[in-house]
């Protein structure tokens, strides 16, 4: 059995593509079961946020092509996703999970929301009965690594969200926000 992660994120695809592969929270348990029903798939976790969708699987002979095709079929897309997907196996999959949990793979370096999103995704997979010893160990380790990164580095000292980064940038343009109006799009 091999650990594999296939995903799409803010670096590999524009928002127009990413939003088409977001999983509705209420449908994730069903999606987890469908994903696990693929041949030789033993364990699954689906991480789905505004900036990334990732499929973590423990399986035999399963790669980017099969998972990409499943993602495309599940969302009813007529266009292949292979040009927007990334794929990591074994040690690289572990390293990737640690980077994601720590906020090192986020649009804004060090943003803390992703850790909570990973915990939610893992909890949903546990409730759906699609985790097992490999993904349990991976996600528990990723949570520990993320906590250690946050406590032993200054990664969260600066802007920790796109909104706080935008406010910081606006402060360089305007001396004061008094009598200013802002329009938020997105």
Question: How would you describe each model-predicted region?
Answer:
Residues 182-184:
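Hydrophobic Val/Ile/Leu positions in short beta-strands of Rossmann-like dinucleotide-binding domains
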Residues 80-180:
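Glycine/serine-rich phosphate-binding loop and adjoining beta1-alpha1 elements at the start
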Residues 1-106:
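A glycine-rich (often HGG/GG-containing) alpha/beta subdomain
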């Amino acid at each position: 059995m091999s650990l594999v992660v296939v995903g799409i994120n803010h670096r590999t695809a524009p928002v127009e593509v990413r939003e088409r592969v977001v999983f509705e929270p209420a449908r994730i348990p069903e999606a987890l079961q469908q994903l696990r029903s693929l041949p030789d798939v033993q364990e699954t976790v689906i991480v789905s946020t505004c900036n990334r969708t990732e499929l973590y699987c423990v399986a035999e002979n399963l790669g980017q092509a099969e998972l990409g095709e499943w993602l495309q079929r599940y969302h009813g897309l007529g266009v292949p996703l292979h040009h927007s997907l990334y794929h990591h196996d074994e040690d690289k999959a572990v390293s990737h999970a640690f980077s994601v949990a720590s906020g090192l793979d986020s649009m804004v370096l060090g943003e803390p929301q992703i850790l909570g999103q990973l915990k939610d995704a893992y909890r949903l997979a546990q409730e759906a009965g699609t985790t097992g010893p490999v993904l349990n160990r991976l996600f528990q380790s990723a949570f520990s690594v993320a906590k250690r990164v946050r406590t032993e580095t200054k990664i969260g000292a600066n802007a920790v969200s796109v909104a706080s980064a935008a406010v910081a940038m606006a402060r360089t343009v305007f001396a004061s926000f008094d009598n200013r109006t802002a329009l938020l799009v997105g």
